[in-house]
């Protein structure tokens, strides 16, 4: 099993004691605070807390706004703290999202490409801050324009003095500043932003990192994310997603497309595989079990490559992902939920994920 966080204690507490802390009430805003406990080989014991607040609008035309605080610390004196807001205006005409984070947290590195061997595993610790702000403006109906800016400033410390990341041959091995300007368009007619049951989501976003934007590196990226939701009745839904990422220019190693996260290609350690380009697709079946408790089953696959044409090559390696999960709805009149997913990837890799709201 790869070194993915395993917050078992949190998963148990979420599924056994959440209802009492999120009891239904008539106020427009709901808040909950939960403990965090986990472990990983590179961190030892992890502990902390998260606070989540959702404001439910009084009209159906306005989508709910949220805010989250998260803090964790580990037995090896590593830490992560972030604040995140997602604010919708009346009628969902404007949307503003912001994220601010400081971390000193280890991540694995195996090299580049889909053939990076397990034996090449080493760890590096980025220390610093990252932040982003995205503005979304409705043009007409479900069509939005999207613009934003992202910035990070990290110092990277490799775990091994003789490892690959100790060599300046790998771009970005010492860290540095990355500033990116983002522009895009979005079609979004989903019925709910937390756990959609019908509708579609299609977003194309281009980003450019360059010196005028505060970046030490010059590269560009195009991300296309498409989702569709098919209602099957009685609280059941089939969710579909396809994602493509293409990167050009001189991108540092930590800005490449990565396999392994809590949203798609679950079951791999974060960054287990990385390259310039990525294509992935997944399907997820979601259903209600009992009252606020639900379950999900998902399967997907993806590829990474140094250029787009290689993604379609017959000899390219396909990375599988599949698993099951539980869901607990937080509030009686909202679909916001806590999800606990167990996923498996290729070659015996697996991971347990605890997160707010659906993966997509």
State where each predicted segment sits.
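Short loop/turn motifs that connect adjacent beta-strands in outer-membrane beta-barrel proteins
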Residues: 25-30, 57-64, 90-95, 140-142, ...
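Outer-membrane beta-barrel "beta-signal"
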Residues: 182-185, 323-333, 349-360
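Sec/Tat signal peptide C-region and signal peptidase I cleavage site
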Residues: 20-24
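Hydrophobic, well-ordered secondary-structure elements that form the walls
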Residues: 283, 300, 326, 340, ...
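Gram-negative/organellar outer-membrane beta-barrel architecture
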Residues: 26-33, 39-177, 272-275, 336-339, ...
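Bacterial N-terminal signal peptides
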Residues: 7-19
